[in-house]
Each structure stands twice: as structure tokens, then as C-alpha cells.
From Swiss-Prot, chains A, B:
It comes from Campylobacter lari (strain RM2100 / D67 / ATCC BAA-1060). Pathway: Amino-acid biosynthesis; L-histidine biosynthesis; L-histidine from 5-phospho-alpha-D-ribose 1-diphosphate: step 7/9. It holds the Pfam family Aminotran_1_2. Its cofactor is pyridoxal 5'-phosphate. Gene3D superfamilies: Aspartate Aminotransferase, domain 1 (3.90.1150.10), Type I PLP-dependent aspartate aminotransferase-like (Major domain) (3.40.640.10). GO terms for biological process: L-histidine biosynthetic process. GO terms for molecular function: histidinol-phosphate transaminase activity; pyridoxal phosphate binding. This is Histidinol-phosphate aminotransferase. Belongs to the class-II pyridoxal-phosphate-dependent aminotransferase family. Histidinol-phosphate aminotransferase subfamily. It is an enzyme of class 2 (transferase). The lineage of its organism: Bacteria, Pseudomonadati, Campylobacterota, Epsilonproteobacteria, Campylobacterales. It catalyses: L-histidinol phosphate + 2-oxoglutarate = 3-(imidazol-4-yl)-2-oxopropyl phosphate + L-glutamate. Its EC number is 2.6.1.9. SUPFAM superfamilies: PLP-dependent transferases. InterPro entries: Aminotransferase_I/II_large (IPR004839), HisP_aminotrans (IPR005861), HistidinolP_aminotransfase (IPR050106), PyrdxlP-dep_Trfase (IPR015424), PyrdxlP-dep_Trfase_major (IPR015421), PyrdxlP-dep_Trfase_small (IPR015422).
Length: 363, 363
């Protein structure tokens, strides 16, 4: 059977290892996963209750207007419901961006190393990718490339803070950059971890309302998968002017988010205590990872997220990840990003102590 | 801002009315929804328990290999896990079919009136649609159109039984038809309601194993949204030879199904009692709808599904649907399919009695 030729260029995405499968494979009693930047404090109590209280409604199709969650997000950000689209994770909004603006004759721009899904979706359409020489976000380099290829570049992805490297631009610098970009180029501000950055340093805070009111060509991406502890429920969102939201809506399949996910997300937004605890613990535990790296003379970039990335000079990140895996610690090897580095999600105090223990033994 | 030109041709999908919103709008205490073919007996006890017992894991990304659910489905159908792909509803598998095989230079074929999502996905790519003159499946007409346009037609959708009309072809006739279709044309057998048809008449039963072993160009679609009572959880699947599954996998975004949906689906497969009760009650209640139609001299097609479609000669289906809506009964008006007809999901005994009551008053 012949398939559309563009499929040939697509590699099938291979996901990280599941904890249960790792436990079985290596005969382990305990497996600690510090690989997917999930919330180490679990699901918020309110979100869990919302799921349990609505489990008996699992037979009913979701409210496809998603009005309850849109109302809650509109209130949080002081925007209109018409400025919102909800996706199966913010990944799905990335997919809409790529499909609405790009094709094989166009290009998108990102820094040297950023979230893998931008490129995965772009390659599905044969879209060209421009990356800056610097791995982290450098606005001068980004602007230089944009200027040189502005006829092709119709989307720019800025990941603030950046996954998998952890650095973050100041909001003021981003707004200045946006002033220089043509109105026909869509600029996506991926704020999947922006709450973490904002907590550490308010200068990093992107205000979606201000963003979309100043720039008709900007879209802000948010998610419930990280701070809000709902990685398994697949809920993210895009915030933009109505014109952009309407275009994305044309690409959305009906019922793209489950009814329990919608209920859980509404409840999670209301759980301030859980959010505060997560943010505070994250950065107090992050300090331990920084101190640990200094002790072992490991290079790292100060992180504005819920993970930290260690770079190696002599040791091989693949060997190290595999050794840790066999001892029940899953971290993310970054060789697939072309880096001899690992990304470690900041876990609970206990999980982190286990990481330090196993890492010390195997480093 | 300019978007890709193909977006202009796409109409935004408008979903059915949500019960809570209808209740608010019309100030109703009770709203009965017989519009989306959901399971009127709710969520199976086992599935509900699986959701409740796993709610505390909502922060963890789903196992993207989906091995537990694939194992359960492989066992149910006596096939390999490699013959399976899981989607966010079987809708998502329809999307993969369209995107893997079709573009603006190709066409797909269906009977006169069938599931709306085939055409919605096809239009996103500017794909041509051929429909038979007959509203219901007529294999001779389908074959005639196929023969005439076989250079263009690269996908055929057969909906067995057919949504929204309810009729169903015999499996033996479908297999004979498949013998005559070229290997490069993908034939999708949409079995979303096939369990209902098989229960009523075993001649309607499509055996996915037999189908894919005989035909390398066939894909079977199944869902957990109807019989298995998980419409809100968005789980469906495709069964085909490995070559087709591999092509679809290239189009799949990671984590396309929530972790609680996977757990619920595994549990639902194991709840035979719930499934049996649903099937038995469905057809005993269906009989009441047939008798009711005969009394009122309303035309209907004998249904092999969990819904029945009433056709009107003089009354207008839009007026009637609106009258019922104001009285708290939501049914599906089929004017958008070009039919002066309504589709009514078979509900519980009480729900159906309320439908008969309000229908009698307003007809």
C-alpha cells in the first residue's frame, strides 16, 4: 500500500520509559522517575476529588464548548473566553500553530536547543527549521536569522523558560523583540514552565493579557501538566487574539479533551495551596542540585523550571543514564538533542536524595 | 495575519448542546439527552472504580506504549499488539486514515449519508468526496462509483452499522465487496456500533482478525464511547496489518490518550455483565420505539445500533427538535445531513417514556 510521500520523512516518536515497565524489566522494587518534569507532589487534592466525584459521568461526551474551564482561565488571566483554545496538552496547540501557518515552502525559527515537539510537528509538513548557533535563547541571533529569512519564517517559537535547558529571557526583552517582528509572523511564547520562572524572578513573568493586547501576532501557551499536576490528563491552552483562535478552532477535532480532564483542570486552578507548596519546594530542592553539581564540578545552567540540566565533559550521558536506570532512577538523557547532558526533574526530598546517592555511586 | 489557504474552506465544528447549558437556558429541572448515543446505563462499575482508584496518578504522563490496553484488546480479538493503534476516540483513527492516504488530488467514497467526521477530516485537506445516490449502504452503487473513479478513490468508509441511519450490511457481503477493491485503496470498516449489530444478528458481525488477515488494505475501527460507556474518556482504536499501523503511528502525537482513559478502558473490557445488560436493554427498549413509530405512522429504518432515526413527511424536524428541547429532551436533528429526520438515542426505560410523552404532546 502506498501512503502519502511525506510520511516517509517522519520518524515515529519514541516515548520515555514507563515506571512499571522499568520495574519489571530490571526486577526493581522501587522506581523513581525524574524524567518527565511531572509534579513530584502528585495530583492536587482538589483535582483528585474532582476526578473521583465525576467518575460516574465518564459515559457522557465532554461539554465541547469547554465553558467552565474557559471561564476559569479567562478569570485567572483577565481575558475573554474568545481569546482561549483548550488542547490535549499544549502540544496540541503547537500542532495547530504549525498547521495553520506553515507548509513545505515555509520555515520556523527557534534557539539552538528547545522543546522537541516544535520540530516533530514541523517535519510532518516538511517545514524548514532555522536554529541559532547558541543553544539557549539569544535574541540578537534570533533576530539576525529572522531578518535574513523573513520571507520564509512565518513562526517563531520562544520557550520561556526553555525546555530542556532551563534558562529564561526577561519579559521586557521579549516584548522589545516582538516589536521588530512583522505582523504576519506568528510568535509563540511557550509558557509551559513560566509559573516556575515567575516565582523565582518576577522579571521573567509573561503576562498573557498584555502580550496579546500589544501583539496581534502572538500566542501564549500554557499547560496543566507541570505546576498543576495533571500530566496524565492532557490539558493545555493557547491565548491569542480572536482571529488566531478562530483559525486554530478550524483545526480542532471535536471533544479533544476528556470530560474528567476539564473537571480536574478547573479544580486544579483553584488549589492555591498545592501550587504554592510545589513552587516553594521546587526551588529549595533545586538548590541541592546546584550544590551537588558544584561539588562534582558538573556544568549546569541556572534553571527557572522544575528540572535541571547537567552537562558532562568526560563522562557519557548515555552510560550514566543507563546505570541509573538499572538502579531504579529514570532521568532524561539528552543525546537525542545532540547534547552530552542529562535533564533531571526536581523530585521530592526523598526522590532527590535517592538520585544523589545513586549518581554518586555511578559518576 | 495570513493563514494557510486551506483553512478558509473549513467550517468550525459546532457540537451538540450540553445538558447543563440547556437546563440553564430553559430553566429546566430535568434534562434528558438522547442525542449522542451515549450509554444510558452510565459508566460500568469496573471502569468507574478504575478511574477512582487511579485518580491519584493524574499527575503522571500516560504509558505511551499503551501496553496494558493493547494487551487486553489483542486478547479480545486474538490479534497481535502490533495490529493495534489507540486513538482519542476512533475519530482520531479516521483522521490518521485521511491524512495517511489522501490529499487534494484524491477522493474518498461513502454511502449517501454516513458519519459526519469522514467528510470533516477530508475537507480539511481539500479531498473530494463521492457519495452514492442511495442514503444507506448499497454495495452495487458503491462498487460502480469506485470502478468509475478508482484512480482518485484511495479510501472507502463503510460504517457498519451506519450512523446516523442505523442499517447494517451483512459481513459476508462486505467481504465479497473487499475482494473486488484494489490493494492500494484503504477500506475502513467503522465498527463503532458493530457490537450492537452483532448482538441483534450474528450475520452482521465483522471479525477484525479475519478481516485483516484476508485484506492487507482493510482497517477496523472500534470505540469505547458507546457500548463500553466511556464517551467522555475519548478512547477508540484501529486494527490493521502492521504496515498500515506503522503509517498511522507516524501521524500520532505522543500521549494522545489520558492515563485514566487507558485504565478505564481496560476495566470496561472486563465488565461483561454491564455489556450484556446494555445490549439486552437496548433492543427491548428499541422495540418500544418501533411500536411508537408504527402508531404514529412515522417512517424508520430498522436499527442495528443504540439509536433510531425517524423520518418525517409533513412535520419539520427542526421545529420538533426545538419543541422537545424546550421541554428538556435533547435529540439529534438531522437537517445538517440534509434529512428531515431526527436521530434518537435509545435511553433507559424512564428516559424513553419521557421522550414518548413529550413527543406525543408536540407531534
Amino acid at each position: 500500500m502506498k501512503f502519502n510521500p511525506f510520511l516517509e520523512a517522519i520518524k515515529t516518536y519514541e516515548s520515555g520509559k514507563d515506571m512499571d515497565l522499568v520495574a519489571k524489566e530490571y526486577g526493581l522494587k522501587e522506581v523513581i522517575k525524574l524524567a518527565s518534569n511531572e509534579n513530584p507532589y502528585g495530583t492536587s487534592k482538589k483535582a483528585k476529588e474532582a476526578i473521583i466525584n465525576n467518575a460516574h459521568l465518564a459515559h457522557l461526551y465532554p461539554d465541547d464548548t469547554m465553558s467552565e474551564l474557559k471561564q476559569a482561565l479567562a478569570q485567572k488571566y483577565d481575558i475573554l473566553k474568545e481569546n482561549l483554545i483548550i488542547g490535549s496538552g499544549s502540544d496540541q496547540i503547537i500542532e495547530y500553530i504549525v498547521h495553520a501557518k506553515l507548509d513545505h515552502s515555509k520555515a520556523y525559527l527557534q534557539c539552538g536547543v528547545s522543546f522537541a515537539m516544535y520540530e516533530i510537528y514541523a517535519k510532518q509538513l516538511g517545514v524548514k527549521v532555522y536554529k541559532t548557533p547558541s543553544l539557549t535563547h539569544d535574541l540578537n541571533e534570533l533576530y539576525e536569522l529572522y531578518q535574513k529569512h523573513k520571507n520564509e519564517i512565518k513562526v517563531i517559537f520562544l520557550c520561556l523558560p526553555n525546555n530542556p535547558l532551563g534558562e529564561c529571557l526577561d519579559a521586557s526583552a521579549v516584548f522589545e523583540f516582538l516589536e521588530k517582528i512583522d505582523e504576519d509572523c506568528l510568535v509563540a511564547i511557550d509558557g509551559a514552565y513560566n509559573e516556575f520562572a515567575s516565582f523565582k524572578d518576577s522579571k521573567k513573568h509573561i503576562n498573557p493579557k498584555e502580550l496579546i493586547h500589544k501583539f496581534q501576532n502572538a500566542v501564549y501557551l500554557g499547560t496543566f501538566s507541570k505546576l498543576y499536576g495533571l500530566g496524565g490528563m492532557r490539558v493545555g491552552y493557547g491565548i491569542a487574539c480572536k482571529e488566531i483562535i478562530n483559525a486554530f478552532y478550524k483545526l480542532r477535532a471535536p471533544f479533544n479533551v476528556t470530560n474528567l480532564s476539564l473537571k480536574a483542570a478547573v479544580a486544579a486552578l483553584d488549589d492555591d495551596e498545592f501550587v504554592q507548596k510545589t513552587l516553594e519546594n521546587n526551588f529549595s530542592q533545586m538548590k541541592l542540585y546546584e550544590d551537588f553539581a558544584k561539588n562534582y564540578k558538573i556544568r549546569y545552567i541556572p534553571s527557572y523550571t522544575n528540572f535541571i540540566t547537567y552537562f558532562f565533559d568526560e563522562k557519557n550521558s548515555t552510560d550514566l543514564s543507563e546505570k541509573l536506570l538499572k538502579n531504579g532512577i529514570i532521568i532524561r538523557n539528552l543525546q537525542s538533542y545532540g547534547l552530552n547532558a542529562v535533564r533531571i526533574s526536581i523530585g521530592t526530598e526523598y526522590e532527590n536524595s535517592r538520585f544523589f546517592e545513586e549518581f554518586s555511586k555511578n559518576f
